[in-house]
Amino acid sequence: MSCCHPRGPARDGADESPTVEQNGILGSGPHLVETVSVPAGVFDMGDAFGEGYRTDGETPVHEVELNAFSIDTTAVTNAAFASFVAATGHRTDAETFGGSAVFHTYATAPGQAVPGTPWWLAVDGASWRHPAGPGSTLDGLADHPVVHVSHRDAQAYCDWAGRALPTEAQWEYAARGGRRGARYPWGDEPPTADDPRCTIFRGDFPNEPTGPVGTTPVRTFEPNGHGLYQCAGNVWEWCADRFSARYYRVSDRTDPSGPARGSARVLRGGSHLCHDSYCHRYRVAARSHNTPESTASNIGFRTVGPRDTRREPISTAVS
């Protein structure tokens, strides 16, 4: 379990995949998130600064070659996910199992503290529709990233939309925006109060924030060189790959897709709860993972697909 997002409790039926074929519309959904083409290329994947956690397996740095693909410019929004649910009747894991993990400062109801990470509360009734818990709504949050979605919920959306979750390599390549070996999507300079650049926790974590705590609209900050927004902070994003801390030692060079075995799935990007005092996983090389049924108020996703030939390719100039 990571301190950044709690592991989901053991749940009956947790090995069953969500079904999205209720209306015979598999693969036909209107994907309401803008996509951009990322050209084929080669990049150095992994932590070149020695700043990662040993158990996350961010090293060794290794060369990866990828074919072209398209990727969402933003995380999937509440509006886009609502369209999917309206079309399919999909019920998320958090709704099925009766609740989800909510950060304590904005939870609308009491909850049981998650062992080892007491700032996380298991709140009955929390879900994508009620992101802070009972009584909370999506009013004003249409353009915020959907949260409280499990890996299986994200995959169900992808199946409906004819998309896929990005491989970990696709995610990092796109997040780097053409910058070779940089710490962040924008370069090496850390965010500051005067130039925040990303949505992370500011103040004394976890009890004394100096500003609002929570998600922000998906286009709050400037995009990176590939046109992607908020690849650092805001919400963790599910990837397709299974997780192994040893995988970088044996990874394929071309279009790697992760280990063949393993129960946990990769998460990338950090969230609005990252803070350098305990978690600096909002770097582009940072890795995390969780069980596929896990949900929390800082976990979302974006999708990939074949290269969109209707769009002009974006430059990969290194700066």
Predicted regions, residues:
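Functional-site microenvironments in short loops/helix caps that host divalent-cation chemistry
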Residues: 38, 44, 48-49, 91, ...
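Short basic/aromatic-enriched segments
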Residues: 287
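Short, compositionally biased
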Residues: 1-135, 152, 177-180, 291-292, ...
